[in-house]
């Protein structure tokens, strides 16, 4: 599926004022158009001025790339960012979420929330009268997935029919990769140990969203998962909040390290992705991370360009 570069604004017009809580919130055509707008912003073919709009960040989880990329994205669009750390606001003293969301809607033009429970994000979206963006929850990481597929598109030239193999924990990142990949016509394979699979309801949702006969598969053999794949992806084995499970997970994921041996089973021209931060020597070897196949730091940069496009779309800046 392709969108005429001149037709991007028309396709994205319906996103003005919308929330982005899940990759499934937008249509396949809108997802493709957001990637095209991201490309235009990155290349300098398109410039957008949001006229001093304000983004409010509510992050209850630690963040480097998401926080900085949102701040820089808003600055490059001519806007400002207010960092609403719960530790230094009344949120940390028990102010009800619904009150905070309504008050911030009077001060800000858009809100990005990074938290543990998806329900908390949904509650912000319910009570806020401004667009709410998912900056990560335990269920999904949609901005990351958009940046991932922009990176794959840049490296491979197209998305439809490509195969992305994710090896590791069936976590929030795997959920968003399945949903976004399905909308873009990408075959997504999840390779994980038994008991660490993505949620069945998300797998079913992705399969129902799939276009261009994209296949969503889950398998327990990492070699089968990566065999012939054009893009390989991994993430930490223990996400934030799971640190107490680290030793158990290290044992369970033995054999799932994205190293040179595993990479050898992929397409000879395969690229390697990781959403960072990485634990070298655990889920990915240092050699693969620094090798010729790695597009990991291009991938990190693309968070900026995707989030610029997203902010411009939901704020009607096109």
Curated annotation (Swiss-Prot):
Carbamoyl phosphate binds at residues 63-66, 90, 114, 141-144, 275-276, 303. GO terms for molecular function: amino acid binding; ornithine carbamoyltransferase activity. It holds the Pfam family OTCace_N. The keyword Amino-acid biosynthesis applies. L-ornithine binds at residues 172, 235, 239-240. It comes from the Bacteria. The keyword Transferase applies. GO terms for biological process: arginine biosynthetic process via ornithine; citrulline biosynthetic process; L-arginine biosynthetic process. Reversibly catalyzes the transfer of the carbamoyl group from carbamoyl phosphate (CP) to the N(epsilon) atom of ornithine (ORN) to produce L-citrulline. PANTHER family: ORNITHINE CARBAMOYLTRANSFERASE, MITOCHONDRIAL, ORNITHINE TRANSCARBAMYLASE, MITOCHONDRIAL. Belongs to the aspartate/ornithine carbamoyltransferase superfamily. OTCase family. This is Ornithine carbamoyltransferase.
């Amino acid at each position: 599926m392709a969108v005429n570069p001149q037709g991007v604004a028309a396709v994205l017009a319906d996103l003005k004022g919308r929330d982005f809580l899940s990759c499934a919130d937008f249509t396949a055509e809108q997802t493709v158009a957001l990637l095209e707008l991201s490309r235009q912003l990155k290349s300098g073919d398109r410039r957008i001025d949001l006229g001093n709009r304000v983004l409010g960040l509510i992050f209850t989880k630690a963040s480097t790339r998401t926080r900085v990329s949102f701040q820089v994205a808003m600055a490059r669009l001519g806007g400002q960012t207010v960092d609403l750390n719960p530790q230094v606001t009344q949120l940390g003293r028990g102010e009800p979420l619904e009150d905070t969301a309504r008050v911030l809607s009077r001060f800000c033009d858009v809100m990005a929330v990074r938290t543990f429970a998806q329900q908390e994000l949904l509650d912000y979206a319910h009570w806020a009268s401004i667009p709410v963006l998912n900056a990560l929850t335990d269920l999904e990481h949609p901005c990351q997935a958009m940046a991932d597929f922009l990176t794959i598109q840049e490296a491979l030239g197209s998305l439809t029919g490509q195969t992305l193999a994710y090896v590791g924990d069936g976590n929030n990142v795997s959920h968003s990769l399945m949903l976004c990949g399905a909308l873009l016509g990408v075959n997504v394979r999840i390779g994980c140990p038994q008991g660490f699979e993505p949620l069945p309801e998300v797998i079913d949702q992705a399969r129902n969203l799939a276009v261009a006969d994209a296949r969503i598969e889950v398998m327990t053999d990492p070699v089968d998962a990566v065999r012939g794949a054009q893009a390989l992806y991994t993430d930490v084995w223990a996400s934030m909040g799971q640190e107490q499970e680290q030793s158990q997970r290290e044992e369970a994921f033995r054999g799932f390290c994205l190293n040179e041996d595993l990479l050898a089973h992929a397409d000879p021209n395969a690229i390697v992705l990781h959403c960072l931060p990485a634990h070298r020597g655990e889920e990915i070897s240092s050699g693969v991370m620094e090798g010729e196949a790695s597009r990991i730091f291009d991938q990190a940069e693309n968070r900026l360009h995707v989030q610029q496009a997203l902010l411009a779309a939901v704020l009607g800046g096109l």
